[in-house]
Amino acid sequence: YFSGDATWPYKNEIENYKYPLRSIAFLWDETEGLRQQHTVTSELYSKCYSRIANYNIVVENVNDAEGPLADKKLAMAQAKAMRAYNYFMLVNTFAKPYVKETAATDNGIIIHKKFDLENESKQYSVQEVYDFIMEDLNAAIPDLPEKPLNEFRPSLAFGWALKAKVHLYKGELDSALNAGLEVLKSTYHKLWDMRPMYYDVVAELPFMDFMSTGWDSYAIHPKADPENLLYQFCNNDNGEPFPFWIRKETLD
C-alpha cells in the first residue's frame, strides 16, 4: 500500500481513516506532518527501529568476532540487507514518496548508522535515506547466499528483489527490470501464474467464484466514475479472487 496502488478494499475504513497509514497512502494525503503524527503509536515504527539497532550491532562487531571469515561476511551481508529493508519500510510509511526533483529537500526519516545510545538522532532527506538503502544493498548482495539457512534469513534473491523495488520506487525502470531479472536466475524462486491456480481451487470449491461480487461492493468509486483513476484489476473481467487497485497508467 506504500504508493497507493494496492490497498485495503473496504470503502468506509479507508474514508474514515480507521487505519490511518493505509488511508494516507491510498488517498495520497500529503497534509504536512500527518504521517509523522503516527510514529509514537505505530508498532511498525518502533519494531523497525528496534530491529535496526540489532542489525547495527552485528555490522559494527561481527568482524571482531571469532569464527570463519565466510561466516562473518554472511552475517554482515544479511544484517545490511535487513537494515535496508527496514529503512525502506520506514521511509515509505512515514515520509513523502520519492520524487527525483524534490527528494534532496523532502524530509525523510531518522537514520541510525551505528548503535549508539548517546548519539543524537538526525533526520535525513528522502534522497539520503534511499542512498543509504542502496549502499547497504550493494554491499550485501555479493555475499548473500543462494539458499539461506532458513526462510527467515535473506537470500541472494531477496537482495535483488529489494533492489528492484527500490529502483522501481525511484522511477528507475531499466534498473528495476535488470535487478528483477537477477531474481529469476535463482534456482529456488520462480514466477507463479495465479489465475490458473485460482481456477483450480474454484473447481474444487465452487462457492469461491461468488466472493468477488461481494468484494466488488467495497469499491471506493464505481468503475465508470470519472473520479476513479484506478482499475480494480483483479476483480474486473478475469474472475480473480481479491481486489487490488492498480493505477490506470500502470495497466496502459
Predicted regions and their residues:
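Alpha-helical solenoid repeat scaffolds, predominantly canonical TPR units
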Residues: N54, D136, D143, A179-E182
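Conserved, well-structured interaction surfaces
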Residues: Y19-F94, Y124, P142-E146
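Acidic, glycine-rich segments characteristic of secretory precursors and extracytoplasmic regions
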Residues: Y1-A6
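Short coil/turn linking the two alpha-helices of tandem helical-hairpin repeats
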Residues: V91-Y98, P148, Y169-G171
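Hydrophobic-face positions in mid-chain alpha helices that act as interaction patches
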Residues: L177-D252
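Short, flexible helix-coil linker/hinge segments at the edges of structured domains or between repeats
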Residues: K100-S121, K190-M208
